[in-house]
């Protein structure tokens, strides 16, 4: 059965561990190590989930949540809290520090667990498959929902957070905003674009969102950079058509390149939308030109084409 061979269930009961394969059945490429363990997620005790929720709330005020404040929030006895925190730390869902005081912090794996547990509870997804892609700020997984779906986990890096907060206007400019919450903001931004563009532009269909995780439809084909096109001119024209339709709908991608255009050789899809800006933005012309220049440069290098940037800009921005 597909579910038994390719996916690990996120909620009990689980009869045996799924068969492991070194090859992903979707991409036919070696499976990357899975940072998310479905067995850990579905085995979380209700007290451990309560602790994760409390840390999530309190990390909006604290970088390290004081132990006394956490105990008061979760209403567990000191021995019970110590035992449950030990489990969470052992599973790498929570970290602790003793300087300048005893405190605890949620890490990405714990944030993953909360989001996936909630999505499973809503029956948006029922099982987790292999990792099928990884980017600078995201991880992509297969999952089972009503059929095979894609999970995009936004992972804004801790090191790059300050740079992102400066360069991306949707990031909060003041107050305490750890990178896990910046990742949720990035996901919200992309989900907003997918919802608005769905049915107008060739993009993945948004299904659900929870924290930093977007559930979307599976897109056939592969990233443009992995393809050898029989008819590059037709695909280039399709890309311009989709960019033009997005522009007319009020969206400039903001990070368009051969890495976030997908094609099956006949149809194209534009993916990865967290950095979009509206055509009314003060930098809209420069951002649009950069997007189109990336595409034109890629086609020129790989297929020796000679597309004109000014013609592309005029086509996309035509009334």
Regions found by a protein language model. Give the residues of each.
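Conserved ATP-binding subdomain of kinase catalytic cores across diverse folds
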Residues: 35-39, 79-82, 91, 112-223, ...
């Amino acid at each position: 059965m597909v579910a038994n061979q390719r996916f690990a269930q996120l909620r009990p009961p689980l009869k045996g561990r799924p068969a492991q394969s070194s090859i992903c059945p979707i991409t036919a490429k070696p499976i990357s190590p899975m940072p998310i363990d479905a067995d850990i997620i579905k085995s979380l005790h209700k007290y451990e989930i309560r602790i994760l929720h409390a840390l999530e709330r309190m990390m909006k005020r604290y970088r390290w949540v004081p132990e006394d404040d956490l105990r008061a929030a979760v209403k567990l006895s000191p021995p019970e809290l110590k035992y449950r925190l030990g489990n969470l730390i052992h599973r790498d869902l929570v970290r602790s520090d003793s300087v300048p005081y005893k405190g605890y912090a949620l890490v990405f794996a714990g944030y993953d667990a909360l989001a996936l547990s909630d999505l499973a509870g809503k029956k948006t997804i029922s099982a987790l498959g292999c990792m099928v892609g990884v980017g600078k700020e995201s991880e992509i997984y297969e999952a089972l929902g009503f059929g095979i779906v894609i999970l995009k986990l936004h992972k804004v890096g801790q090191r790059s957070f300050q740079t992102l907060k400066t360069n991306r206007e949707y990031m909060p400019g003041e107050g305490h905003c750890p990178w896990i919450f910046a990742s949720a903001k990035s996901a919200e931004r992309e989900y907003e674009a997918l919802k608005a563009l769905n049915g107008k532009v060739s993009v993945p269909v948004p299904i659900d969102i929870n924290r930093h995780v977007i559930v979307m439809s599976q897109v056939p084909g592969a990233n443009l950079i992995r393809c050898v096109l029989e008819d590059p001119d037709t695909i280039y024209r399709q890309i311009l058509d989709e960019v033009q339709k997005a522009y007319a709908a009020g969206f400039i991608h903001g990070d368009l390149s051969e890495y976030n255009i997908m094609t099956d050789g006949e149809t194209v899809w534009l993916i990865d939308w967290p950095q979009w800006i509206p055509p009314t933005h003060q930098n809209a012309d420069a951002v649009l030109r950069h997007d189109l220049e990336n595409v034109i440069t890629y086609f020129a290098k790989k297929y020796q084409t000679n597309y004109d940037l000014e013609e592309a800009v005029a086509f996309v921005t035509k009334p």
